[in-house]
Amino acid sequence: MKKNKLTTLALILPITILTPIVIASCTNKTKVKKSSSLDKIASNLKLEYFNNKANTKASSVQKDEIKKPLNLPNDVVFSVKDVFVSHKDQSVLIVKYTLKKGNEIQEYTYEIKGFKSVYEKDKIVNDLSQANEDFKKIVNNIRLKDTFDFKLAAFPNQNYDQLLPSQIYKNYYQGIEIQQHKYQNELDIKIINFLYPDGDFGSANKNGTLKLSLMLTDKKNNQVYYKLLEVSGFKSNPYGVDENGTIPGIGTERLKPKNQDDYFSKTQLQRYEIDNEGYLQILKRQNNDKNWKELRPDLNATVSDIKHFDEKAKNVGQDSYESAAYKGFTLPVYESDGKISGLALAGKDTPKGPSWVDAIGRNQWQIGGLPRTLPNEKYRQEAMQTFSLGILNNDSHKNNTYNKTAGTTWILDYQKTSDNKYPTKWYFATNLHVADAINENTLSINLMRLMDSAQIKTTFRLSNLDENIYNFGFRSKEHGKNLLNHGLKKIFDGRDFLKTKPAEYLINSQKEKYKDVGNFTDFAVFELDFEKLELVNVWKNFLGENNGLVTKYNNYNPQELAKVITSNYANNKNNQIKFLSKSYLSDYSKIDVPLKYRQEDAKTWFKKYDELFALGWPNSTEDFFFKAYVDDDQLKYRTRDNFSLWTNSDYRFFNNLTQQEGGQPAFPPERTERGNYLSYAIGFRSFIQKPGIVDAFIAVPQIGNNLYTSSDNKKYINMGLEYLPKHFAPAGGASGTSVRNQKNELVAIYHAKYDSSKTGLAAAFRSEGYDYQGLYGNYNLPQYDLIYGGGKDQTEKKSYREAMKDIYQNNNIKTALFPDGFDKIPDEFKFNNN
């Protein structure tokens, strides 16, 4: 009897790319003929798996992981119909595929051998077809509820039929309890994995279905078998949204144009028109084909008004009226004489879908970033200047209860010293919605960082389990006092950073509704004074020995401790940050990378453009790059209290950058040494010819179901210039991530994730403004600079420079960013408003 070990089961998000409709509609009509011109082609084809077979279980392979054959004739269409494991040998994958030439279509099968042997620890898995007949009858009769039930440790008070498939999929690793109702003397059942039947959470949540990967033990002979059981009856909803309200992404294959080469050669405007047509069709279907007037009863515009708007919109690079209405954009409302009475907000955040361009050559469900890996020195440089920030507060309403807030923060600036000692007053940047947790109840903060020992192209472990990641905890040296104003000081935030209140642009009915609502950009700065901070704990891998660390660092003086925390930033002048002096809206050519290049230019084409680098510290709950059994020691710690370093790099680099001695790298340097670019996502894009550029007030004034409420209990509307970083959609905890270019120039700060589009919003530090020529009434994209100030639309003192000047007036303070003090704006950051 053939025996194989049971493979480890990958927890990486499942893969699915929808087969083009024309092929799918033909496969049911296929009949195998005695002789076909396609037979010879099929006999010469060699099919391959995308990744490393030796480390992959055949049963975990999805259809789109099979490579298109290189020697396929141009007039033949190849499509994978199904993949499944050989019953005889579970290290063999059988691929069922079709070939189509003209009106002729044929179906074939192909065996790909060499997948990882199937094992679970030291247990042997046998071919189920070789089991005795009595046992096979039992296996064929296994049914959930009838034969067995299960409960998840993560949801002890809920049955599985009260949980969405996505909830089960994301949380089963915390533990599964099996209750077996039948065949207790004959059979032992274990659930070792859950899979989405169609590869994505949307269809699973819509249908309430999952595939259970079962390990079955015959108690009579202790033989172990493997079975995949598709089960229904889980909680469902008509739209397939997950437990967080995330609407599943639109399958990117449905958005692809038929001729990609033709698309690549077109202008950005022509590409937008192609993409937008397909995107709107799907958006309309998701809204049950309702007219935009039904979806936006707040809008009022005649055919003539819309025609006039669309003509003007094209001249200033904006979306058409109807298209913008479906997307939930802010739009003008017209009076009977055609004049604009004001703008109307949609009052909700409209779902956003992914871009097929962002997913080219990739698994569309995994393009949200690269975990626990530094592909190159640029990312490492950013990592040395970036921290996971933990803020611990007393709960003012409950005794002995604490609230912890986590985000990402990074070095912005430091006060220079006159005695050449290492600086101890440092300025860190993060999001307003993170810094809002700093208040009079703040007891302590943690700064967690990757230490200098960390190397590129290696895979790190979870934050609390890695020897290279240290967590430093601080409280005020003034015992009995909380941290605010005793070692920790708030310097600046983006509340009401613009002169004009949002309500002033709105129609009368909304003026009243939003009269007390402010404007904001999600940015804040705080100061840490290491002279006033006491180090209370230090730890790295909490499974190891940490006692010596506290003793070691407690002997450091404030200068020495600041030097360790900041990785000697003050002495590394060449690595210190700068700011982008001209936004990508103002000069899009710097970031307008081609979608196709000549092969001879492969090593140089990208050097003409800016690249973007984003690195943050999200919690580990959405890090699906672990493997059961291989990573068991980490899986049980994959919680909100553990963090995964995350970048906007290529997910395909994961575990594939280590080069064996004498071997060739899996990816050429021209790929691994780069950063990334801006997303082509359509749902946010307000500047239609500039992918990745967004006016927040027009496209996303509200993020989620409600306006942002700050610590002052006031509500705020999102305003200003935003960017959409490509391939960056990490979990909570990454808020505050900096987006910078290859020159270490700060571009934006990341603050909102849109999982369904695998991108998010990053607030720009600088906007030169943009004149819409009356398209939106008296509203234009505002001019401002959050660091240097001086924008004509900016509230006085609402910049980091002016805030520092106000706080430290007459103190003759100088910093790295402002070596001559805070009175003057550097020439390159002055606005030309002549």
UniProtKB/Swiss-Prot annotation:
* Topology in the lipid bilayer: Lipid-anchor
- Residues covalently joined to lipid (N-palmitoyl cysteine): 26
Principal cellular location given in the protein's record: membrane
> Which keywords label this protein?
Cell membrane, Lipoprotein, Membrane, Palmitate, Signal
The cellular component terms of Gene Ontology attached to this UniProt record, alphabetical and capped at eight, are: plasma membrane
Q: Where in the cell is it found?
A: Cell membrane
Q: Keyword Translocase: yes or no?
A: no
The signal peptide stretch is 1-25
Q: Which InterPro entries match?
A: Lipoprotein-assoc_dom (IPR007326), Mycoplasma_peptidase_DUF31 (IPR022382), Uncharacterised_MG067 (IPR022381)
Which Pfam families does this one have?
Lipoprotein_17, Mycop_pep_DUF31
Name-wise, this protein is Membrane-associated lipoprotein
In which organism is this protein found? Ureaplasma parvum serovar 3 (strain ATCC 700970)
